[in-house]
């Protein structure tokens, strides 16, 4: 055991924030950056009209539309811990990026709108978190507005998601009548709007407010005490072992917009969340985070994070060992040696050169085309390969071509870089070599078209081809004559053949005609 390295690893907290769109995910990210001293003021959703955009929404289209379509990666120091926070897209069309991001974290923070409760995208993302077996912490947001009963919100976690919710604090009122938060662990109340000269926190004795405090004889506070009594009688008690096993979620209430309850949440989160742990490698081995040899995997590639430089960043989750500038690593996919001279991390929108990084850290590598999403990198003689990252089979397809044939170079450069990010997938018509894009949702095409024009000066024509089902075929079984008016024969960017069918009926027709041919949803 390398004790010095392990001490560094144990100070890391690497987590993703997940939610349904508009639940306040980006706002709580901003408030955490504010608490970490990375930014001086948080950009709110309202401020988007004035041009003060959220720090973690860096892409121009995100600023214009007020949505997150990429995963932002940010780091800061807080209470002696190194925080690596990944703000993920809430929009379902970009769930593939979110799923990959969840492979790179040790915990998740689930933000829920207290007026709406658990929404469809939250359910989908929670399912992935559960499959990964990582702990999830719940933040019931928007307490500054009227919402559902807190007892109902906690009960819904078990009813809908099948996870035990344990309240760590409890609201005293909500909306216009919000008075404060009862911190159950520390037996104190955090006041929502303390008067001038008044302490923000009021210590409680045996659950009772001291005489002369704003809570003394307050009917709303008395009602809260009754709810807590009910909760403690019927609910489960906090069990960190269950939390780490993904069987129980600590529940915090607050308002990200007014920065109420966020600090208490972050303080308790850094204490309760796990440090980086072991990772599976080579199919059946466990790699310890304090293993001496450096290793990691690339979970995200992003072009043009700095439009002035037109560069590409490959994001690496460090899994073991220690990164240092100039480190020589092997790219497992090719066996090629790569020297990591230029690595950065992100503090808000600023880039900071990385001199060292350990397990749990997220490092951005300047990429000239060496890396692909899912690549494993390692130093040392022992080959280390991490499990493949999840891939979605597209359900929407569009033919794409440049509007100006004189700008083929810009078109091909933009196409290649954006496809390598993994948000859209590229296919070529088997006969004509036409370009076809595949995506999970329509918004991905809109973002592709927008970025081609604004980042690569290449306007594109996009037309739907009306096919919805993609199925790969073994090249040994392929006969080009199988292509018909009911399907389209294409090849993916690695040259593998597949058929695009208009619908499930067309696929069944193909199976009936060629019963011995095996088609697969993924290669």
UniProtKB/Swiss-Prot annotation:
Compartments in which it is found: Cytoplasm
Signal peptide annotation: none
A Pfam family assignment: RF3_C
Ligand binding (GTP): 19-26, 87-91, 141-144
GO molecular function: GTP binding; GTPase activity; translation release factor activity, codon nonspecific; translation release factor activity, codon specific
Keyword Cytoplasm in annotation: yes
Any one of the GO CC terms: cytosol
Domain named tr-type G: residues: 10-277
Keywords: Cytoplasm, GTP-binding, Nucleotide-binding, Protein biosynthesis
SUPFAM superfamilies in the record: EF-G C-terminal domain-like, P-loop containing nucleoside triphosphate hydrolases, Translation proteins
GO biological process: regulation of translational termination
Family listed: Belongs to the TRAFAC class translation factor GTPase superfamily. Classic translation factor GTPase family. PrfC subfamily.
Record-linked PANTHER family: PEPTIDE CHAIN RELEASE FACTOR RF3 (PTHR43556:SF2)
Role, per record: Increases the formation of ribosomal termination complexes and stimulates activities of RF-1 and RF-2. It binds guanine nucleotides and has strong preference for UGA stop codons. It may interact directly with the ribosome. The stimulation of RF-1 and RF-2 is significantly reduced by GTP and GDP, but not by GMP.
Name listed for the protein in its UniProt record: Peptide chain release factor 3
Organism encoding this protein: Lactobacillus delbrueckii subsp. bulgaricus (strain ATCC 11842 / DSM 20081 / BCRC 10696 / JCM 1002 / NBRC 13953 / NCIMB 11778 / NCTC 12712 / WDCM 00102 / Lb 14)
Protein encoded by which gene: prfC
């Amino acid at each position: 055991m390398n004790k010095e390295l392990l001490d560094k690893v144990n100070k890391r907290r690497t987590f993703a924030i997940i939610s349904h769109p508009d639940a306040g995910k980006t706002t709580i990210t901003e408030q955490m950056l504010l608490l970490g001293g990375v930014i001086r003021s948080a950009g709110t959703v309202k401020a988007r009209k004035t041009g003060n955009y959220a720090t973690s929404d860096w892409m121009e289209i995100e600023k214009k539309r007020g949505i997150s379509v990429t995963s932002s990666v940010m780091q800061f120091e807080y209470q002696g811990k190194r925080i690596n926070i990944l703000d993920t897209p809430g929009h379902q069309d970009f769930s593939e990026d979110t799923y990959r991001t969840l492979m790179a974290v040790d915990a998740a923070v689930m933000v829920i709108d207290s007026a709406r409760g658990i929404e469809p995208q939250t359910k989908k993302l929670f399912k992935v978190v559960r499959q990964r077996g990582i702990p999830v912490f719940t933040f019931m947001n928007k307490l500054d507005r009227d919402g559902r009963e807190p007892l109902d919100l906690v009960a819904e976690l078990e009813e809908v998601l099948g996870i035990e919710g344990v309240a760590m604090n409890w609201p005293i009122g909500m909306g216009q009548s919000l008075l404060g938060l009862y911190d159950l662990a520390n037996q104190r109340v955090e006041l929502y709007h303390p008067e001038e000269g008044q302490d923000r926190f009021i210590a409680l004795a045996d659950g009772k407010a001291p005489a002369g405090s704003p809570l003394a004889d307050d009917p709303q506070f008395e009602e809260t005490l009754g709810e807590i009594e009910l909760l403690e009688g019927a609910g489960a008690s906090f069990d960190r072992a269950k939390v780490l096993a993904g069987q129980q979620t600590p529940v915090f209430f607050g308002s990200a917009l007014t920065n109420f309850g966020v600090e208490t949440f972050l303080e308790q989160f850094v204490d309760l969340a796990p440090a980086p742990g072991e990772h599976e490698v080579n199919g059946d081995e466990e790699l310890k985070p304090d293993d001496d040899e450096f290793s990691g995997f690339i979970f995200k590639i992003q072009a043009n994070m700095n439009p002035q430089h037109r560069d590409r960043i490959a994001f690496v989750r460090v899994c073991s060992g220690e990164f240092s500038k100039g480190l020589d690593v092997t790219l497992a996919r090719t066996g090629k040696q790569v020297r990591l001279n230029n690595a950065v991390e992100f503090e808000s929108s600023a880039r900071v050169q990385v001199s060292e990084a350990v397990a749990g850290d997220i490092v951005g590598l300047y990429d000239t085309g060496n890396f692909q999403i899912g690549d494993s990198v390692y130093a040392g003689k022992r080959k280390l390969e991490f499990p493949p990252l999840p891939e979605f089979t597209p359900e929407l397809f569009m033919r794409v071509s440049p509007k100006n044939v004189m700008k083929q170079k810009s078109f091909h450069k933009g196409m290649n870089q954006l496809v390598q990010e993994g948000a859209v997938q590229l296919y070529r018509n088997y006969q004509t070599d036409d370009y076809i894009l595949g995506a999970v949702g329509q918004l991905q095409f809109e973002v592709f078209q927008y970025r081609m024009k604004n980042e690569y000066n290449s306007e594109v024509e996009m037309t739907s081809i009306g096919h919805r089902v993609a199925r790969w075929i073994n090249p040994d079984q392929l006969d080009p004559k199988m292509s018909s008016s009911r399907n389209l024969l294409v090849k993916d960017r690695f040259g593998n053949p597949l058929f695009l069918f208009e619908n499930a009926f067309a696929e069944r027709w193909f199976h009936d005609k060629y019963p011995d041919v095996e088609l697969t949803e993924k290669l």
